[in-house]
Amino acid sequence: RDLTGDWSSDVCSSDLSSVGSVSLAVASSVPGSTSSTVCSTSDCTIAYAESGFIFDVPTLIAARPQSDIALRAVKKSDTSQACVPGFANVTRSLSFTSAYINPGTGTQPVMVNNSPVTSSPSSLNLTFDSTGTTLLTVRYDDAGQMTLAAQYDGTTANGDVGLSMSGSDVFVSKPYGLCLQTASSCTVAGVNDNCQVFAKAGDSFPLRIQAVGWQADGEPLTAGNLCSNHIITPNFQMSDITLNSALVAPVSGDSGTLSPPQYSHVLGNQTTTSTSISEVGVFRLTATPTANGYFGETVSGGESGLVGRFIPAYLGVQANASLTSSCGSSFSYQGQPMAFAIGQEPTLTVTGFNRSASITHNYDRGAFWRLATPVPNAYTSITGKTSLDVSGRLTRSGTANLAQSGADDGDGAERYRWSGETLQYTPALLPLADDYPFIAAIRQTFSAATLTDTDGACFGDGNSCSAYSYDFSDSPGSEVRLGRLRLDNAHGSELQALDLPLRIETWQNLAGGSFRVEGLDTCTTAAVLQTPALSSYTGQLSQQNYGNDKVTLIAPSAGLGLLRLQPPGINGSVLGGLPATPSWLFYDWNGKGREAATGLARFGIYRGSSPMIFRREVYR
């Protein structure tokens, strides 16, 4: 540079657009210098340092503007990061670009001071203060890891042609929360018109999850907020986000298990995962990303609306019952009512199950139990003997008293017990081989309709509804015998007592079928047979002179007893009987149907049959 004029000192400026050093010297002077050049730096060398921009974009929440981000013009080689002279209190035009890092593509620009910044440079006029600092407002309407870069190139107007300054920062933008949605239309938790059946417990249903941006600070992370008027952040992806469920109804019920316990959010507007809940009820679902799991940052999750109602996939049914012998501990007679064994009355247990065959413990909670009281069909005989198993041979009597139990105890089941009835086989009019002693074999059936609740959950394989049958247990059970009470005839002197033999017999498989004395009878007692009676007087006997007080019952023992008639002192005959004889000991004595037995007592000398003359004519 040429310096002319009369002066003792001068100030000049020098700049260099690249990093390096410049040496100063006096090439010539007029008049000439008699001494060497003296500089404030050693060797008269000026060092030019690399300059650039430093700024730090903090972690953003998608769609939420972040203001007051300081961008500073600094000397990069200067550890004190002092401002470069010439950028104080000036306005400069900087070019900004953005780039996708993870994921590597996207659709949204980075907004800097409300101007979109993409991979193509965008110029912004920025005013730097005395410290070389300007403030930025940055917003990004998506999620992911991004780079924001700033560039300044000197101009003639600014007197810094050739100057190049740059700076960049990698930042993370995360969703505000996760919007969880299902096809459930439940708005009021419970069993009502506003919470219809949604799915069966254990069956899969689609759970739709969207990562969404910010709309307002402090907004609750619920579906009602996040799933309405929020932008979607399709660039959000993250693995192993925890899924959970919270029971809303029934209160104090079993929370069940949500499956799967986690999911991976993939790129795109929505991630749909196939989900199932193991229990009956109404729930809310939550998604919770792992803490510090998104580029070192924690992403907020979200909560669904009401999801339900869930019902059992199917109903399981079990039943049991047993009879007990009515004539002691050995057997019952045909026609004799057989009671249910104590504690073994017909009992039906209905249990709700999910698709995995696990009990739905909430099914018996309050109104979630949707099965009306099952109505059993008629009892049927299944002895395998045609005449015994025919419709109508087995009958029941008495009134069934229903007791229902098990509600609200959280085992998913309720029990129905019917008591007060007795069963009996109608006695055969004429004994057959089928009537030899047999074990009572009873089956009870419930129709598919009566085992289907009002939501359609029913007994079956989970795909179709079925009727249910079960067989009575033989423990203790009862053997059944065809029996009769028989009174034999007798005759004797009118001066002596006369006994009519009494025999209790049962039909046995002996000699091709015959009635034999039943020595095991313990139920035909004097109290059962009550007072004997006389009827059908002949000869000199009449009710007036020979009433019921003249006959006495000697109760049967081991199947044998008698009616003892006092001596009348006059001739005649009379029928002795037991009017209170139980109907199961009736028999068709006279071909007129089953009736109680009578025995004929004859007093006096017996003449025998009336004399008859037989004549035979032979024709040749």
Regions from the PLM with identified roles:
Residues 1, 9-620:
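Core sequence-specific DNA-binding domains of diverse transcription factors
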